[in-house]
């Protein structure tokens, strides 16, 4: 059985092409467990999670990447945020009926993919591509060609393992400033495309790589764990409350007696009463309950 929730980087020594392989199960379950999403929405979040994990592994600096789908369809928002430590969180917003067999375009409607790269130090970069491809992988490949002009292929699979949702994916990318022939890259992509969902989700990573590339010279690096981690906190909620007009905050307090701030990512609730609000206004952080 594979070790899920790990990302593996590898390098083709003879082609100056790098690769990544990731499988997720527990991380995906934690993202889904606080929501009653229809199955097609779960599938999209699984694909987004895999894609974000693969993309964050391409970062050469500390920071995070957000991959977001937006549109006018019944799923008008789906987003996964992850950082270079492979800590992930995500959420979707559903505002209409979802057909059981809805594909990506049916879910999102007229929309686009937004990729936001936020370094720990330096300026944020945002790229936007129209939802023109039939799959998320195709849209992201288009993004790479437009933004980084690096030949890139993504292969994403979703399914179940032992009755629990799981997903996996692989990325191939030509190394920057290398003279890899397109035919060589296409050859590796053709090999990778043969991966079956069952193989990717149930076999150890080294066996998957051997099955695909046993005739190539491949260096495999130590894996990196992938995990769910939400960055919400009582302090961040307090900071958000500072940005609201006092009249609005006082109105909620008068009506409800307290303010309940809910994190869509993890389901946590943070409650603030009148005394807490007074402390916030005095620039004092409210004590954790």
From Swiss-Prot:
A Gene Ontology term for the protein's cellular component: cytoplasm
UniProt-annotated location(s): Cytoplasm
InterPro entries per the UniProt record, alphabetical: Heat_shock_Hsp33 (IPR000397), Heat_shock_Hsp33_C (IPR016154), Heat_shock_Hsp33_N (IPR016153), Hsp33_helix_hairpin_bin_dom_sf (IPR023212)
Cysteines engaged in disulfide bonds, as pairs: 230-232, 263-266
GO BP term (any one): protein refolding
Main localisation: cytoplasm
Record keywords: Chaperone, Cytoplasm, Disulfide bond, Redox-active center, Zinc
UniProt PTM: Under oxidizing conditions two disulfide bonds are formed involving the reactive cysteines. Under reducing conditions zinc is bound to the reactive cysteines and the protein is inactive.
Keyword Membrane: no
CDD domains: Hsp33
Family matches, as Pfam families: HSP33
Claim: Iron is one of the keywords in the record: no
Xref: SUPFAM superfamilies: Hsp33 domain (SSF64397), HSP33 redox switch-like (SSF118352)
Molecular function as annotated in GO: protein folding chaperone; unfolded protein binding
Sequence similarity: Belongs to the HSP33 family.
Functional note: Redox regulated molecular chaperone. Protects both thermally unfolding and oxidatively damaged proteins from irreversible aggregation. Plays an important role in the bacterial defense system toward oxidative stress.
Protein name per the record: 33 kDa chaperonin
């Amino acid at each position: 059985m594979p070790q899920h929730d790990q990302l593996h980087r590898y390098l083709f020594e003879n082609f100056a092409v790098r690769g990544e392989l990731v499988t997720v199960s527990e991380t995906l379950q934690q993202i889904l467990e606080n929501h009653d999403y229809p199955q097609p929405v779960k599938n999209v979040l699984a694909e987004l999670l895999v894609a974000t994990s693969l993309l964050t592994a391409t970062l050469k600096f500390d920071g995070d990447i957000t991959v977001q789908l937006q549109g006018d369809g019944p799923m008008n928002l789906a987003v996964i945020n992850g950082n270079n430590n492979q800590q992930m969180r995500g959420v979707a917003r559903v505002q209409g009926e979802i057909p059981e067999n809805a594909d990506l375009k049916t879910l999102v409607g007229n929309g686009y993919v937004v990729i936001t790269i936020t370094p720990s130090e330096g300026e944020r970069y945002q790229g936007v591509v129209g939802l023109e491809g039939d799959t998320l992988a195709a849209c992201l490949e288009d993004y790479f060609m437009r933004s980084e002009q690096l030949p890139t292929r993504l292969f994403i699979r979703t399914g179940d393992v032992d009755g629990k949702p799981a997903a996996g994916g692989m990325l191939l990318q030509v190394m920057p400033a290398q003279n890899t022939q397109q035919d060589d890259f296409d050859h590796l992509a053709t090999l990778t495309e043969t991966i079956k969902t069952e193989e990717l989700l149930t076999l150890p990573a080294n066996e998957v790589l051997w099955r695909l590339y046993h005739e190539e010279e491949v260096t495999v690096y130590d894996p990196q764990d992938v995990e769910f981690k939400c960055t919400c906190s009582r302090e961040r909620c307090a900071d958000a409350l500072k940005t609201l007009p006092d009249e609005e905050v006082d109105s909620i307090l008068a009506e409800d007696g307290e303010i309940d701030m809910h994190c869509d990512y993890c389901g946590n609730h943070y409650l603030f009463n009148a005394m807490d609000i007074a402390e916030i206004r005095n620039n004092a952080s409210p004590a954790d309950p």
